[in-house]
């Protein structure tokens, strides 16, 4: 297997995710004794490129018009762009990847890749579909940090054409970056489950904030309101794309949630204490059985 500390990593898109990958690779892998690896970064705006180089995170920075140069040098490429922008990137730079390179993404929807990949990639380039389950309300390179991925989940949607050696290398890599639970699944299952655990939650949080009639309602709020609405501080362009790209699965979850809300509403309006108590007790037991998203006990 290739040695991670001697590889060249290309990061395309230097926002909070791309920046965190670069910083985590620098701290956890390339800081090892005898390391010969490098980090190359590329971004549309140049301010963060200068920051990455000046901070000693990136060895080389490339403006958007020099992307091909980065790709020709990179052994592993993280494409940290929006889903459809990632597809366009793969299409436009198909012939520029280094032979034998591993390419991976960070997108929150996967079905669009599975349908398009066979025609987008060369046989000597291995695209491993991945989803780092980490995020935050802040955006941009300045918000990135080397510990961003610690104790988070990573999902791979392995394809039949993926090399066993490359796939194992990627699992080792993300473990070194701090991820503590790695799951392998299909693109369809990924989109269905992420539609529930992530996208539906963002819809609910957004709807809750939108339904507030009093802009000063937070004066009456406690931890519950804060917990439920934290993710409503949303990146609108990104989440619009994610919602629409996964519309069938997401809307099915919204319908199911709406049905449960109606059941609660009916029990409350009819003062059916027994029914309401049973529903709440069932909810508690079900949540306990689900376990924690956190992979390490606090």
Which residue ranges define each predicted feature?
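Short beta->alpha hinge that forms the Motif I/post-I loop of the SAM-binding pocket
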Residues: 44-45, 81-82, 106
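Interdomain hinge/lid region at the active-site interface
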Residues: 216-286
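Internal alpha-helical scaffold of NAD(P)-dependent oxidoreductase catalytic cores
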Residues: 146-231
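An anion/phosphate-binding loop that grips the pyrophosphate of nucleotide cofactors and donors
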Residues: 74
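NAD(P)+-binding Rossmann beta1-loop-alpha1 motif at the extreme N-terminus of oxidoreductases
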Residues: 1-71
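N-terminal Rossmann-like NAD(P) cofactor-binding module of classical short-chain dehydrogenase/reductase
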Residues: 77-78, 104
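Rossmann-like NAD(P)(H) cofactor-binding subdomain of soluble oxidoreductases
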Residues: 85, 89-142
